[in-house]
Every structure is written in structure tokens, then in C-alpha cells.
Amino acid sequence: SERENRRVSANETPAGPVAADTIEPGMKRRLFWLSNLAIFMIGLGFAVRANIAADLQGDIFNLLDLARSASMVGEVIGATFIGFALTLLFGSALLDRVGMKVMLLFAAVGYLAGSVMVIAAALMEASSSAYWLVYGGLLLTGLGWGAVEAGTNPLVAAIYPDEKTHRLNILHAWWPAGIVAGGLLGLALGALSLPWELNLLILILPAVVLAALVATAKFPVTERVAAGVGYGEMFREIGRSPGFLIWFFAMMMTATSELAPGQWVDLALSNVVGMQGIILLVYVSALMFVMRHFAGPLAERVSPVGLLWFSSLFAAIGLYSLSVASSPLPAFIAATIWG
């Protein structure tokens, strides 16, 4: 049958993706750890952008157009989210066409090239060219960010079909771990009065390592291909599953409550609560790292939907409390509830 033929085609040539059950345990561990590194890299990048936002404004945009400099920061940070949304939306849909290896190589190159472009903009005179270099560089890192999410989630699900919840929780714990590392490194660079561009050089390191690991790894096909489900059938299933649309919009709101506020914590709160906002971001991310390791057992006790409901409630209370905090102690209490 057509489905059986598609299932047979899942075992492709050695140069291409293969069925997950033909991959050796050692290679599976390598794929899992390079996925963790990729998630760590995007968390690190999140912290780096928070670290350098004020420096971009002070060293480049203020000299270019003082009246619009704050808006320019918003525009270039926004470019990151545009790139993230594009590759997450279209990259996920086209993953079987391009392959997980190409997707993750693209992510590594995006972070490498994007970081170099922002450094280049910092080294040249303030001009419209410098602005567009920063914009293009952060857009590239955003495209890489989305490519990581589009590639690593189905990769881990494919190699550990019987441990999905556990393995995916561990995988996504490396996102806040990257933020903690990036935030602390940024604080250290500032305390030592070192150039802020070093934040971007640090971000290049995991990108280079990731590219090397991905280039020499053997990747599986996705679960859809392995099961023999057709491409068109996959999209038709969306229309037959109203619950998918509910979770789609729920995820949009989740991203809104986590990603956007987190990116602006340092720039928005540093002058309001009497402390560096990046410290709050590091603290919240550390809480996330710990809680994500316990998410599996909690979900089993209260159900995934129940856990999401309680998490949303705490996030709403925490974000509102953070918006009205005016000193360090209330800010830390609000951040604890949010995290």
C-alpha cells in the first residue's frame, strides 16, 4: 500500500536520515546532547540580547538618532522575534523536506553570522549601515532560534518515543540554563569593564561546537515519516482536530507571557526597581531550570492541563506584580511568582 511504501522509504541512504530504531544508542545520546546544546545556545542568545540592548542604544543608536534611539532598540530586538516566528512556522512544516541536519546547521550558521554582523556594526561609525547590520544580525539569530525549536523537538521525540515527556522536559530545561549562564557572564563582563561585544563572542562558541557536532551526526526521520503518514494527511489532521487550534493559541499566549517580558526585563526594570534587571532575569531562569526538572512528576499528579492552568495563573499574577514593583524586594517576590 501507499502507506507501507512511505514507511519503507523512511530507511533512506546512509547519507540521509534513517529510521530512529536503526540508530545506535551512542549516536542517540550524541543527538540528545547536541539538542541540549542547541537549546542552551538559544537561551544564551536570549540573555546576550538583554545584556547588549542598552549598549546598542548608547553606542550606536543614540549617535545615529537620539530622538528615535529607544524605538530603534525595539525594532532590532523585534527583528529577532520575526525571524523566530518565520522559521518556527515554516521550518516546522518543511522539516521533512529539508531534514533535521540542515535545519540545525542553519541554526548554528545563523547564530555565528548574526553575532559577527552585530560586532561589525559596533566597530564601524554610527550610520544607517550600522543600524541595518544590527537589524540583519539579530534577524539571523532569530531565524536560527526558530530553526533550533523546529529541529530539536521532533528529533528528541523521534529518538526517545517511549520517554518523550521526560526527555523533552530535560531538553527545555537547558533554555533557562542558557539564560542563567549568559546573564551571569554579562554581569561579569560589566563588572570587569570589558567591552560588551564580548557577549557576542561568547555566543559564537556554542554555535561553532553545534555546527561541528551536527555535521558529523546521523539523524533520524521524523515520527510522521516513520509511521508512513503522508504530508497532506498531516495537514488535513489539523482540520479534524479542533483541540490543536486551542493549544496553538494557548502557546501564542504562553510565548507572549514568557518571551517578550523576559527580553525587556533588563532594559525596562533597571531604572525602576533600583537594581539591574538582568539579575531578575537570571533568578527567574534559575527557577525555571529547577521547576522543569520536576514538571514530569507534577504533570502526572495534576494532569498536563491542570499544570498549565496553575502555571498560567502564577505567571499572570507575577507579571502584574512585576509591572507595579518599585524596589528590589517586591520585584524579587513578583519574579518568584512569575518564574
Regions found by a protein language model. Give the residues of each.
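C-terminal transmembrane helical hairpin of 12-TM major facilitator-type secondary transporters
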Residues: 305-339
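Cytoplasmic helix-loop-helix junction between adjacent transmembrane helices
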Residues: 137-174
